[in-house]
Amino acid sequence: MAAAADAAIASRARERLIPARDAAARALEEAREDEAQWLELEEKISHLRSRAVPDDGFDALVDVGGGVHARGRATSASRVFVDVGLGFRAEMTLEEAETRARRGAERARDDGERARRELEEIGRVMGDVVDYLRSASTVGGG
């Protein structure tokens, strides 16, 4: 009787904890990728601000979609277009873009920290289930 109850506990734990662990691991990886992208944007903006841009602009490679770039002429470096999600780009000053990048990186860090804590908690619960099942099998004569 106890063995059937233990098997049910193990089965229920597998059904719930493993998918939750996998989802938390994916969330952590996505948060790390997001943070890296925001930090890269912040670095590019900083580089653009530090360049001495001539009054008549500068040549640049322009992303035209699908991984294709074309040579273009940027007439000003004071405003940039930032991907704000869902395929939308917003025109911003360098200061606005830098603030957006900083906030995005902070949000991604917070999301990653939440996912990391959730992963740790799931790991603790999984360990508790394993410990319980081991002790139950020892007490039950297994």
Language-model segments: which ranges?
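Intrinsically disordered, low-complexity regulatory regions in eukaryotic proteins
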Residues: 1-142
